[in-house]
Amino acid sequence: MPKELKELKDYLSVLKRPDARSVVVYKKKSKGGLLSTKFKVRCSRYLYTFSVPNQVKAAKVEATIPSHLEKKVITNKKN
């Protein structure tokens, strides 16, 4: 069962942990046209999720991902 993080400070502390392996970034457009971004961090025991509704803030959060973690970006493309 994934653990949901509510605070940015908690998300950043999980990224710095030595057991953090990879980050998957999901960028999904909602019906209203807003872009919602979810960050999923895989650690040894849990999958931690962090959701950001603001696109500008999401870009800043994505820039804070350390380079030693494997990063995968998935966008929702429906025609």
From Swiss-Prot:
UniProt KW Signal keyword: no
Chain segments annotated as coiled-coil in the UniProt record: none
Domain of life: Eukaryota
GO process annotations (BP): protein-RNA complex assembly; translation
Annotated Gene Ontology cellular component terms: cytosolic large ribosomal subunit
UniProt xrefs under Pfam families: Ribosomal_L38e
GO terms, molecular function: structural constituent of ribosome
Keywords recorded for this protein, A-Z: Ribonucleoprotein, Ribosomal protein
Residues annotated as signal peptide: none
Keyword Secreted among record annotations: no
PANTHER family: 60S RIBOSOMAL PROTEIN L38, LARGE RIBOSOMAL SUBUNIT PROTEIN EL38
Family from the record: Belongs to the eukaryotic ribosomal protein eL38 family.
The protein, known as: Large ribosomal subunit protein eL38
Organism from which the protein derives: Theileria parva
